[in-house]
């Protein structure tokens, strides 16, 4: 029996023993060494040859990833590790650290129970480390810490043993501070990472060695020895004595929970159904015999198998050939194959039980975030996947050859499925198709993928996505239907800052409000009690509130009014950009008694005109997307770096110094960030590290409001000036 065949049969056996399974993610800031670490873990588990590990980038099996040397998608792999006489199945997901691909991290965190947080010893905890750790803790995923690139502290920064320990203490304290602030209350102390219990390891992923306290006690190797091995350039011997995979996978087995343990406290957070029901109990107990519950975290397109959905089985078992129900798309599908991952390969089996990460082919219509269950037992969907930032940059895409148009549309739909953080707008009338993403790099990669699928495209210069809102209040104004028989009286004001924050943090859910149970959340967020009880719809951070009393026929057109409100919020009156942070209050209404005269053709234009008229009367303004920019630069170049920021309408928020390095923290409008990579590199002669994080939207400065409005409108083929309020209210 070949080694590979042995591995496969072992994986198939361990799948049924949840207490011997560990589902883990590796998360870090870009270039802190995640993929190198994953490769060496695989080599240790006998999945790829040891010589190639680190250069092979086994999990970066996309051409673009290998060319750019960064991870773009989250890749999956399963392996077997022996620890203290038992064998464990470890399902590993390598996630991207670049801010443009944060959506993949969010989705991977839903599939795992534990995370190895990799921090570069030289750079310490960076902004993206905080973001990914925050995402992990929000999903109740337990962390352990691996401090990587320790050899560089010794050989490049020439730190001695006591300075090394000082540096480590600082990194660990920072990590624990984040865990204390973000972990669920009952785990704040339990999940602290500690050197003494072995939940912190130190090492070099590139040179394939690691140590933690239990291994030091076992092997007798201490920090002074490490110091010696590194300065004498003898890390190969070190890697034989304390191989990376043994230390890290041992730490994973020892400190990170099995599905059997974690589902008991994770399910209540990610599934809001009845925990006492049969489905609820099956998930809490990781029961392979219970009703089926799978959460899809990712969809990719395979040349041979078509769409492959990756997900986590929380309850029951998913079987080849069975018919399943997709809760989100309300459709049935027949499962063609199920299996687990070994690197980029899928190994098919007959069924995959609760507690495992599964690859499913045949689940047509599945998208990331979909819930799959048995056809006979429809369950409540899992909570939506909330990604921390939203798309801020758009490019227009056209096919080079007109004959490719139909194919382009199909490929764009696929891209939207594969990566839910991309927003795709297909306009078959004008032939202009828009893709919005998290940043320049994100969109470059997507354009490359479209070309790879056989459609040659041309893309426009990147365009920034703006938002519309109001700075003042107005109303009541009257919106009339075309037949003049229906009238709606509307008031408008900005949404309270505290309510905006509650929506952003997910304390207030988006969607049409059913019943009164949401009122409590609105009141807690600081909203007026009367208004809180009357919210009908929360849409894209806007509120629609019915303040009327006893209006006849209002209930019969309630859904139409919300449709009209939502379509108005999708294309605002200033520049046909999305609206955010606006509170629309319906104060009064006159509605025709005859249903024929109050259909969609009458109600929709009336409510839209009323909303647009109110917005144009309430000091409408554009908001622009902002990014936080972190630059780590030698002191001599600090002046050049800050000048780069200030020339881009940026603001310096904070500066900290460590040794001769300075970290500059600033905020810069996304519109000014194009071409920043090249400019900052030349300004600092390549001696800087920088990263960005999306920081929401802020009001565009007054002197730019008019120019940008005209630019956006002209680009969209509209008249340069927006209509005034009386155009809508006349």
From Swiss-Prot:
Chief place where the protein resides: cytoplasm
Domain tr-type G as annotated: residue spans: 19-260
Keyword tags: Cytoplasm, Elongation factor, GTP-binding, Nucleotide-binding, Protein biosynthesis
Superkingdom, natural source: Archaea
Record-listed GTP binding positions: 28-35, 94-98, 148-151
Pfam families found in the cross-reference section: EFG_C, EFG_III, EFG_IV, GTP_EFTU, GTP_EFTU_D2
Modified-residue entries (Diphthamide), positions: 597
Subcellular localization, as worded in the UniProt entry: Cytoplasm
Any one cellular-component term (Gene Ontology): cytosol
NCBIfam families: aEF-2, small_GTP
Family: Belongs to the TRAFAC class translation factor GTPase superfamily. Classic translation factor GTPase family. EF-G/EF-2 subfamily.
Protein name: Elongation factor 2
């Amino acid at each position: 029996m070949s080694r590979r065949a042995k591995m496969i049969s072992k994986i198939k056996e361990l799948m049924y023993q949840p207490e011997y399974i560990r589902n883990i993610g590796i998360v870090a800031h870009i270039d802190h060494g995640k993929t190198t670490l994953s490769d060496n873990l695989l080599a240790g588990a006998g999945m790829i040859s040891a010589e190639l590990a680190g250069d092979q980038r086994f999990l970066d099996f996309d051409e673009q990833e290998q060319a750019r040397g960064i991870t773009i998608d989250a890749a999956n792999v399963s392996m077997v590790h022996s620890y203290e006489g038992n064998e464990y199945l470890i399902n590993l997901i390598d996630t991207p650290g670049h801010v443009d691909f944060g959506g993949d991290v969010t989705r991977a965190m839903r599939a795992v129970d534990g995370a190895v947080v990799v921090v570069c010893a030289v750079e310490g905890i960076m902004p993206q480390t905080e973001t990914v750790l925050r995402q992990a803790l929000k999903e109740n995923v337990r962390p352990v810490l691996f401090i990587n690139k320790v050899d560089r502290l010794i050989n490049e920064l020439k730190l001695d043993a006591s300075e090394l320990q000082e540096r480590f203490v600082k990194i660990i304290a920072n990590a624990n501070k984040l865990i204390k602030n973000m972990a669920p209350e009952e785990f704040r102390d339990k999940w602290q990472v500690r050197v003494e219990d072995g939940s912190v390891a130190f090492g070099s992923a590139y040179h394939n060695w690691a140590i933690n306290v239990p291994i030091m006690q076992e092997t007798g190797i201490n920090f002074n020895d490490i110091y010696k091995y590194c300065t004498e350039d003898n890390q190969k011997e070190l890697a034989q004595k304390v191989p990376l995979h043994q230390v890290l996978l041992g730490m994973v087995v020892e400190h990170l929970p099995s599905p059997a343990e974690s589902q008991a406290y994770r399910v209540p957070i990610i599934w809001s159904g009845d925990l006492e029901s049969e489905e609820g109990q099956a998930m809490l107990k990781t029961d392979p015999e219970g009703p089926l519950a799978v959460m899809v975290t990712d969809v990719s397109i395979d040349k041979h198998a078509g769409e492959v959905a990756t997900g986590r089985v929380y309850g029951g078992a998913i079987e080849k050939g069975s018919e399943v129900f997709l809760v989100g798309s309300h459709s049935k599908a027949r499962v063609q194959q199920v299996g687990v991952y070994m690197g980029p390969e899928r190994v098919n089996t007959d069924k995959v039980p609760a507690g495992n990460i599964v690859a499913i082919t045949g689940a047509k219509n599945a998208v990331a975030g979909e819930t799959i269950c048995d056809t006979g037992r429809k369950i409540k969907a899992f909570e939506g996947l909330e990604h921390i930032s939203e798309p801020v940059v758009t490019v227009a895409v056209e096919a080079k050859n007109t004959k490719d148009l139909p194919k382009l549309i199909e490929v764009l739909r696929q891209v939207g499925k594969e990566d839910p953080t991309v927003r795709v707008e297909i306009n078959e009338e004008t032939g202009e198709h828009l893709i919005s993403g998290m940043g320049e790099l994100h969109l470059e990669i997507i354009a490359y993928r479209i070309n790879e699928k056989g459609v040659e495209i041309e893309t426009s210069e990147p365009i920034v996505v703006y938002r519309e809102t109001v700075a003042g209040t107005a109303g009541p104004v009257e919106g009339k239907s075309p037949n003049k028989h229906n009238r709606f009286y509307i008031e408008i004001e900005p949404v309270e800052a505290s309510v905006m924050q509650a929506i952003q943090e997910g304390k207030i859910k988006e969607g049409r409000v059913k019943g009164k149970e949401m009122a409590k959340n609105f009141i807690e967020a600081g909203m007026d009690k009367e208004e809180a009880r009357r919210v009908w719809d929360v849409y894209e951070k806007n509120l629609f509130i019915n303040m009327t009393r006893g209006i006849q026929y209002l209930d019969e057109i309630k859904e139409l009014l919300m449709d009209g409100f939502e379509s108005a919020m999708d294309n605002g009156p200033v520049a046909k950009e999305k609206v955010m942070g606006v509170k629309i209050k319906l104060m009064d209404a006159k509605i025709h008694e005859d249903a024929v005269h109050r259909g969609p053709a009458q109600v929709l234009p009336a409510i839209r005109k009323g909303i647009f008229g109110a917005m144009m009367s309430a000091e409408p303004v554009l908001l622009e997307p902002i990014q936080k920019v972190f630059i780590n630069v030698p002191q001599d170049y600090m002046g050049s770096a800050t000048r780069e920021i200030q020339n881009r309408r940026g603001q310096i928020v904070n500066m900290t110094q460590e040794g001769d390095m300075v970290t500059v923290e600033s905020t810069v409008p996304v519109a000014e960030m194009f071409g920043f990579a090249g400019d900052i590199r030349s300004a600092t002669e390549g001696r800087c590290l920088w990263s960005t994080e999306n920081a929401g939207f802020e009001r565009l400065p007054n002197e730019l409001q008019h120019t940008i409005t005209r630019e956006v409108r002209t680009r969209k083929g509209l008249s340069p000036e927006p209509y005034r309020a009386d155009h809508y209210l006349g």
